[in-house]
């Protein structure tokens, strides 16, 4: 039994040394520490003012909140960052070359830490709603890679956040796979199965201190559903309903994985409104507002995920009705929620968002014009490659019509044509299964591209001539170059 040191955030920040690697809990802003990283950022600014440096390596489960990524990036306190981010200040620092960023599939992050591929982890900073004297840590609204961080870090600091009730105990299913060789299978055959424990057990001597906090997750709200996202959602729902009618999906449906954001929320709402789609389960990364609404409506029966990334009003609703949600929700580590083994076994319908798609079905999820990072690949690759059905969505126009997300060739490749089965935009659906590259190109141009760009893309296809893959190196990036030169892809000129 042990009494842990009670620290202020500033005292905790004093324990961190320049050049150390700090692993933070959180998967999205859900469950991410707030007080300690903000204090580290403030201390870094103080050190810089005195001619000294305090910069750290930052590892997380995924993106975090403004008090972590935002504060540290603004202070210039991040040496390197992995595996995913979504903060404007950090994105700017990465794209300006001031912060080294390593993008990776989220399912692989915990094992990369355990294998030592990312070097030693000096500190783990973990948000918890409870910690016992014998070292049992109950997490808050996400799991992410926190179990691995706790076990591999030399020392642990805990933010004990009173905003999250201790009644969260029991919502988590903590399990770490064995490392190779002879790793055993994950014994999870249904979305609702449990294979682990409800808390993280650590040696209490590793816990260097506890900082008491009371702060909500820094999850922003979602935009209202637009006509474009509504149409994308309707197209997804109608396509899936059609798959049931054709006998290509079971009548009882299959578990769903959905990305996060405005389009994902619109897709889930449309699926909930579609009478031809029966109540379904979800095995996903991020459980967001739309999932909770569908659960209350009886459309989602059970949701397993890595984080409860919902707006604060929705989170308060969940906590106020926690016994209603207890048998319907489970939070898992990201190497379980995103495990390719489980994605294939459960037969997941995977629905993710693309930045751009080319006419062969290759997807760019991460970069603008091939150069500027947006966020990272996240879990889309984990799910897309192994799903029963792999769907990518995007609008048919961007930047007021000056950009076509449907292009001859993506400027950056994240998910190749071998992992992508269906493309859906507000214009329609391109089913790529069983199609040759030329057949895929025709389907994507005719069903997914905006009418303003179909003629241009048809011209490109004609120039490709007779070949297995309809590409011409001379013109593959003509639309991107036209935007770079004139600010409008419609100005593209192809050369013979």
Q: What kind of feature is each model-predicted range?
A:
Residues 1-496:
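Conserved alpha/beta enzyme-core scaffold
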């Amino acid at each position: 039994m042990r009494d842990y040191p009670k620290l202020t955030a500033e005292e905790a920040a004093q324990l961190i040394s320049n050049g150390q690697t700090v692993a933070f809990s959180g998967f999205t802003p859900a469950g991410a520490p707030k007080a300690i990283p903000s204090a580290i950022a403030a201390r870094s600014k103080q050190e810089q003012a005195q001619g000294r440096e305090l910069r750290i390596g930052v590892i997380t489960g995924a993106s975090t909140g403004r008090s972590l990524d935002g504060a540290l990036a603004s202070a210039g306190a991040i040496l390197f960052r992995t595996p995913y981010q979504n903060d404007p200040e950090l994105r700017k620092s990465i794209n300006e070359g001031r912060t080294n960023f390593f993008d990776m599939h989220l399912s692989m992050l915990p094992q990369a830490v355990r294998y030592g591929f990312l070097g030693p982890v000096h500190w783990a900073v973990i948000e918890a709603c409870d910690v016992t004297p014998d070292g049992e840590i109950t997490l808050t609204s996400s799991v992410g890679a926190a179990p691995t961080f706790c076990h591999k870090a030399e020392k642990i600091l805990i933010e004990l956040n009173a905003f999250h009730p201790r009644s969260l105990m029991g919502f988590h299913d903590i399990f770490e796979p064995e490392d190779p060789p002879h790793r055993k299978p994950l014994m999870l055959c249904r979305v609702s199965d449990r294979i682990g424990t409800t808390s993280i057990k650590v040696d209490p001597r590793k816990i260097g201190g506890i900082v008491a906090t009371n702060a909500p997750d820094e999850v922003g709200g979602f935009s209202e559903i637009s006509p474009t996202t509504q149409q994308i959602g309707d197209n997804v729902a109608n396509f899936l309903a059609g798959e049931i009618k054709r006998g290509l999906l079971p009548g009882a449906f299959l578990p769903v994985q959905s990305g996060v954001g405005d389009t994902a929320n619109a897709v889930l709402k449309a699926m909930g409104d579609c009478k031809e789609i029966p109540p379904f389960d979800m095995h996903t990364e991020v459980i967001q507002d739309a999932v909770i609404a569908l659960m209350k409506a009886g459309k989602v029966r059970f949701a397993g995920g890595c984080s409860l990334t919902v707006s604060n009003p929705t989170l308060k609703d969940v906590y106020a009705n926690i016994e209603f949600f207890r048998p319907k929700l489970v939070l898992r580590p990201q190497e379980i929620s995103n495990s390719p083994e489980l994605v294939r076994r459960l037969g997941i319908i995977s629905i993710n968002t693309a930045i751009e798609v080319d006419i062969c079905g290759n997807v760019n999820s991460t970069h603008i014009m091939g150069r500027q990072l947006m966020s990272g690949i996240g879990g889309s690759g984990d799910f897309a490659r192994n799903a029963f059905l792999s769907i990518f969505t995007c609008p048919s126009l961007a930047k007021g019509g000056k950009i076509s997300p449907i292009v001859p060739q993506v400027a950056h490749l994240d998910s190749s044509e071998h992992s992508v089965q269906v493309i859906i935009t507000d214009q329609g659906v391109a089913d790529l299964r069983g199609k040759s590259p030329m057949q895929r190109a025709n389907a994507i141009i005719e069903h997914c591209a905006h009418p303003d760009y179909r003629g241009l893309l048809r011209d490109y296809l004609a120039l490709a001539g007779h070949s297995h893959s309809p590409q011409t190196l001379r013109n593959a990036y003509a639309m991107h170059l036209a935007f770079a030169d004139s600010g409008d892809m419609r100005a593209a000129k192809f050369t013979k």
